[in-house]
Swiss-Prot record, chain A:
Transmembrane annotation, as ranges: none
NCBIfam families to which the protein is assigned, alphabetical: NuoD, PRK06075.1
GO function terms (MF aspect): NAD binding; NADH:ubiquinone reductase (non-electrogenic) activity; quinone binding
InterPro entries: NADH_Q_OxRdtase_suD (IPR001135), NADH_UbQ_OxRdtase_49kDa_CS (IPR014029), NDH1_su_D/H (IPR022885), NiFe-Hase_large (IPR029014)
Subcellular location: Cell inner membrane
The organism of origin for this protein: Geobacter metallireducens (strain ATCC 53774 / DSM 7210 / GS-15)
Assigned protein family: Belongs to the complex I 49 kDa subunit family.
The protein's name: NADH-quinone oxidoreductase subunit D
Subunit structure: NDH-1 is composed of 14 different subunits. Subunits NuoB, C, D, E, F, and G constitute the peripheral sector of the complex.
Predominant location category: membrane
Curated annotation (Swiss-Prot), chain B:
InterPro entries assigned to the protein according to its UniProt record, in alphabetical order: NADH_DH_suC, NADH_quin_OxRdtase_su_C/D-like, NADH_UbQ_OxRdtase_30kDa_su, NADH_UbQ_OxRdtase_CS
Keyword entries, A-Z: Cell inner membrane, Cell membrane, Membrane, NAD, Quinone, Translocase, Transport, Ubiquinone
Intrachain S-S bonds: none
A Pfam family that the UniProt record links to this protein: Complex1_30kDa
Domain of life: Bacteria
PROSITE patterns xrefs: COMPLEX1_30K
GO cellular component labels: plasma membrane
Organism field: Geobacter metallireducens (strain ATCC 53774 / DSM 7210 / GS-15)
Protein name per the record: NADH-quinone oxidoreductase subunit C
Amino acid sequence: MASTEIMTVNMGPQHPSTHGVLRLVVELDGEIIQKITPHIGYLHRGVEKLSEHRTYHQTIPLTDRLDYLAPMHNNLGYVLAVEKLLGIEVPERAQTIRVILAELTRLKSHLVWVACHALDIGAMTVFIYAFREREMVMSLYEKISGARMTSSYFRVGGLSSDVYDGFEKDVREIVDTFPGHFDTYEGLLTKNTIWLNRTVGNGVISAEDAIDYGITGPALRGSGVDWDLRRDNPYSGYEKYQFKVPVGEKCDTFDRYKVRLVEMREAVNIIRQALDSLKPGPVLADAPQVTYPPKENVYNTIEGLIHHFKIASEGFPVPEGEVYQGVENPKGELGYYIVSDGGNKPYRMRIRPPSFVNLGAIEKMAKGSMIADLVAVIGTLDIVLGEIDR
Amino acid sequence: MAETNRAVIKLREKFSASVLDVKEFRGEVTVTVKREDIVEICNFLKSSLAYNLCTDVTAVDYLGKQEPRFMVVYNLYSIPNKDRLRVKAGVPEAGCSIDTVSCVWSAANWLEREVYDLMGVVFNNHPDLRRILMTDDWVGHPLRKDYPLQGPGREPYKGRLS
């Protein structure tokens, strides 16, 4: 019998499907994967360390750089955790706008996922279409916050400002046109023979293994586990909205693809319901120790000016204690664990990154399959290296 | 409410000697246990109380604030019961180690490697305890409180951040 030799191949960090700085050292027997050793790159923004040296408000711009595809979700998890520590209640209008923007962000993130996943496997058209649609959400971001990517729009206690006139019209235009676009993607991919051959039965991970590896989000639901934080641990008033939580059956790449596409349709549903329930009202909590005073007070009264200055430079004290807040990010459960010692800075802030934990299961998912299928497995996890390496 | 929590009652029943403290803050229950029994307790929480998802493993450095210096924190979630629980175990600076729970949840494998890398807590019997975010030859553990923000061997910047 011919003897076989194991070959070691470096995949990444420049490989187009490793999305940035991921390097996989793959040991191959022919084309079959025997072992994968991930080296998850050295981005090192040091967000956790930096946040120990900044006030609670100053940390917000650090959080949306974690996962640059879903900045508002990262803001949301952080401000919810700080609000929980403080024990303050956010007004209803702010909560509804937060939900609308969070779901738009989910669309934005999933659009990049479907684009890049399809491109990794070799479908170019979907990439161009999805980025075209994402542009609509991006310009909405720009109108709201002035930034196309890193919005930093949410504040502890509510929003940095109310939305502009015509916001509802713009959002309605998005929710009215997007379902048609989803049909286009499905038309291009769902029954495409090449797509099916590359995704069905690829990257299988059973429900039990997926939970064991701590996988969350669409990747877990693709394995048939019916679990969604928005429904099971509701925050920001998600309990008021009706939506389906899609789950897969075969636990493979195709199921995770289907789950994310249904999730996009459900996001449109949630945005519609939230728009219908949007009423006028304040967008900042009645907590003057924590929130910035209204601009007219800052400009016209000395007390307002001093107060604004104090909050901006010194921050605000937060009661001693520790909380954990998880939110359902497009990638999975993003959690903030904050320990406060009573000061104006987090004593310790830990970010529970979904991509990091999901990537931990890559060997389990890809072992024994062909190296060409590894590309599809990386794509189906929808990783963002900025979040993995924080 | 912490005293009526199902997990707390069961843990007190079964591990009365190892439960050091039970606290509730903003509706979240935290149980502090002895580090020697962490694997046994986690096994019990997973198999008998259905805390099947190990959401997070992390550590807090209480340098000069309290003894023991490190607190290893396990954020657990039960998918069937939709219930969260936080378990903590203190680890002293001398003999800075605790047993691994990666035999209970595979998710703990990478999370513990990160704690080891950034905090310097050693996990006994861990299958693959290597640095994960920093390079292999990196000196020091960046998330420790005595590790300077600007990095080692640099004159601290005297401006806003330092």
